[in-house]
UniProtKB/Swiss-Prot annotation:
This is Small ribosomal subunit protein uS8. NCBIfam families: PRK00136.1 (NF001109). One of the primary rRNA binding proteins, it binds directly to 16S rRNA central domain where it helps coordinate assembly of the platform of the 30S subunit. GO terms for biological process: translation. Part of the 30S ribosomal subunit. Contacts proteins S5 and S12. Belongs to the universal ribosomal protein uS8 family. Keywords: Ribonucleoprotein, Ribosomal protein, RNA-binding, rRNA-binding. It comes from Lactobacillus helveticus (strain DPC 4571).
């Protein structure tokens, strides 16, 4: 079966593993998924990730993060720009997620970055997802 939205699949696998309190989740690799994983790690939403070669496209193993009492660090993940309805914004119109408590992941000419970094660089782009 052909997957029409691999980024939505990536976010859904993380969301489902997080809800089931799994320690880690394996996801088929791609460059944009690696970039999103790096952002999630840098912003403190996941513990770590590693890319393994499986003689095909590779696999990203994402290690989920939980609080000291087992509470989830990721409260929500939402896909914004979809293949059927792309969502592009200018630098002035970049969204704030939960008044700055969450992040928007934006694909720009400067790479895949957070909404905060995009504001600092004054670049707009495609809003991929919200994470809070």
């Amino acid at each position: 079966m052909v997957m029409t939205d691999p980024i939505a699949d990536y976010l859904t696998r993380i969301r489902n593993a997080n809800m089931a309190k799994h320690d880690s989740v394996e996801i088929p690799a791609s460059n944009i998924k690696k970039s999103i994983s790096e952002i999630l790690k840098r912003e403190g939403f996941i513990r770590d990730y590693e890319v393994a070669d499986d003689n095909k496209q590779g696999v990203i193993k994402v290690f989920l993060k939980y609080g000291p009492n087992g509470e989830r660090v990721i409260s929500g993940l939402k896909r914004i720009s979809k293949p059927g309805l792309r969502n592009y914004v200018s630098a002035e119109d970049l969204p704030k997620v939960l008044n700055g408590l969450g992040i928007a992941i934006v694909s720009t000419s400067a790479g895949v970055i957070t909404d905060k970094e995009a504001r600092q660089k004054n670049v707009g782009g495609e809003v991929i997802a919200y994470v809070w």
